[in-house]
Amino acid sequence: VLPAFGFSSTTMDNVIINTYPAILLIGYGNELRSDDGIGQRVSNLIASWKLANLYTLCVHQLTPELAEILVNFDVAIFVDAYPATVEQDVQVSPIELVDTSVTMGHSSNPSYLLGLTQALYGRSPQAWWVTVPGVNFELGETLSPVAEQKIEVALQEINHLLKTVDSDGEYKPKYHHLAFGSSGFCSNQQE
């Protein structure tokens, strides 16, 4: 159940004007597979910031049922881990909708979930995907030192993103664009 949208607003002549977009941050991944739990860890850390217009959600995987929640927000930020080398860094990329005519099953990726939200409700939030490198995806509940270090970078990037999103949910990223391979993993491409 979502809390009431009590984000910051100003009142002029008895008209309430929202000055901040409603933002949902979804951290996802399996906390029992070491670095795969990065997304949920980041979501929990950001929840402690207690920002009035920011809601956080931790899930094991992205499911179609999340579309019903996403439609209520202006901006969505998805946070997940990706298998990487020590040299790779946090990546922030705008997410484009995908065609939802192909069924993805019970779990999906952010692009498909946004496309589904658009198809079902006629709108979807502006969205970004924050991917954080991890090196250990074996069974376990402890994050690798690389993951711990990159989480700090992710928090800085998300903080910058939150400060840059305006009242319309618009943002002009200065980051690299991610291309999605057939394996479901991302490859970094310069724009």
Residue ranges, per PLM feature:
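N-terminal amphipathic/basic-hydrophobic helices that include classical n-h-c signal peptides
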Residues: 1-11, 182-183, 187-190
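A generic local secondary-structure boundary/capping motif
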Residues: 13-14, 67, 117-119
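Nucleotide and nucleotide-moiety/phosphate-recognizing core
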Residues: 16-25, 31-97
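A short glycine/serine-rich beta->alpha loop
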Residues: 28-32, 99-102, 139-142
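Residues at secondary-structure transition points
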Residues: 33, 37, 104-108, 145, ...
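A conditional alpha-helix N-cap/helix-loop micro-motif detector
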Residues: 56-59, 110, 151
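Helix-loop-strand module that forms the ligand-binding subsite of alpha/beta enzymes
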Residues: 82-127
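Phosphate-binding/catalytic loops
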Residues: 112-191
